[in-house]
């Protein structure tokens, strides 16, 4: 049976299985969802067995459990290790959703729900391609699966798990569907990712909240101080001012800049899609270079003082911010983390206390386009989408990808099917049914090409 027919005859079942996963709110960041995490892992274990795995198990870690499964074809055949994650981001703000985030709906040819794309929908693509190959007797190499439950919080337990289970996870290449394409009719393969460093900043002033009339103008306001500190991290040219930050940043090669310049990109439509009137970033680089090949710094959240209804004239005792920096390959997140800690604490005035706490991070990654598995993925996209995919770097981070290379000694192929319009991490996350189908076709072709 051809793959298109198989998808058509089984799509209702595929979606029912996906929806059973989505209805389990596996939010790794919230301790209140610990039972949901275990339930989602167990559901994946069942689905992997039903798809054709020889064995599947839920394995403990220092945090949330992982799911491992494998299909053994031959000890002499190569092995593909499929990585995915079953945890999702919190759904807030709930009032911005057009439908319930954990009650999936199909509208306008798209699945709407938290995890529809990131990463339950994309994970299901991998599993259903595997299922088809097993049932049709087309699989010629070994396949292993490792699904983790902490990707959305920086994979804090996975590094130790990899080191403890190197033999179990031994493979020739890793396949990941957790990235995006340039467009529905513009398939692309991700050749690189940025790294990440993330901190929480706490600024403390007086020992209690003060009356802004009695003390305002005489006592430093921690929120004002925090805003001033953060405003100095980036200069007028969009460069990060932290000393030695750029020491390990390599200039984008001219050949790669030429490739990026050839990517179809409508800056006006880009601005319209995200609702901004102008773009801003590092001087001397294009928008696509800025958000993929160059480092960046962002304030992800800032709070303090009174934020309830009405007014309260208060000079707050504390102010907080969560900030992140996207890194490029060769920048080490631990080194960058310490540079930021040193810089912000040294910049702090003596009338407040500043505490900077690194939260999580990881290194960037680059995949060579001459790797046999990359070329198999390229042919997979061409078969399913009717055109050769563009090779692009992406601005997001999957910190564990660099750990795979360092610990397991193998490359990762980033064969993702998401779109920017899928609104991952945001209200109204969605995933195209058409791309879901084409994704299964592409992964099937990947495995068949990799056999060769």
Q: What residue ranges belong to the model's regions?
A:
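An extended, acidic, His-containing surface patch that forms the Zn2+-binding/catalytic region
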Residues: 50, 183-184, 241-318, 329-342, ...
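Glycine/charged-rich beta-loop-alpha catalytic/anionic-binding loops adjacent to active sites
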Residues: 102-115, 207-209, 383-387, 424
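A generic structural motif
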Residues: 117, 207-209, 325-333, 362
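Hydrophobic core residues within well-ordered beta-strands of beta-rich domains
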Residues: 197, 319-321
